[in-house]
Regions:
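Residues lining hydrophobic/aromatic ligand-binding pockets adjacent to catalytic sites
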Residues: 2-4, 8-135
Length: 135
């Protein structure tokens, strides 16, 4: 969402509109040009919106290399938001949440630190980091 109108409320220019992902194959045709390879989804998405959520980070801890790759495909004024990994907010990778391991367990804390280090690779393109709890 871009507010460029004269006299627009100054905070309006800080608003960003985006979706919870950019990697949906079904968007090829309706959103991405027909035949677009997955490797071009993010830069094409970023040409139309100013923010996106990387929901993939909930399912697996991203590497610093992967996050650097995202950064290189994004304009400077873009913000990428990401979910903390399931291992941090769900207490592990099991089907049921483990309340004794959520946020306050050595393994969860180690994954949280690795996640933050990886997301730091976004630099100024980093948006909010989200905690999606299973409750």
């Amino acid at each position: 969402l871009r507010a460029h109108a004269p006299g627009a409320h100054p905070r309006m220019t800080d608003w960003r509109l985006g979706t919870s992902s950019w990697s949906e194959p079904a968007w090829v045709g309706p959103f991405y040009p027909p035949g677009t390879p997955a490797g071009l989804f993010l830069p094409l998405y970023a040409a139309r919106y100013r923010a996106v959520e990387a929901d993939v980070t909930y399912y697996r801890l991203p590497s610093e290399r992967l996050v650097r790759g995202w950064r290189e495909k994004l304009p400077e004024d873009f913000r990428l938001c990401a979910k903390f990994p399931r291992s941090v907010v769900h207490g592990g990778s099991g089907a049921s949440p483990d309340p004794g391991r959520i946020l306050d367990h050595p393994e969860a804390l180690a994954d949280a630190q690795r996640f933050i280090a990886a997301m730091a690779e976004l630099g100024g393109r980093a948006g909010p980091l989200l905690l999606q709890f299973p409750y």
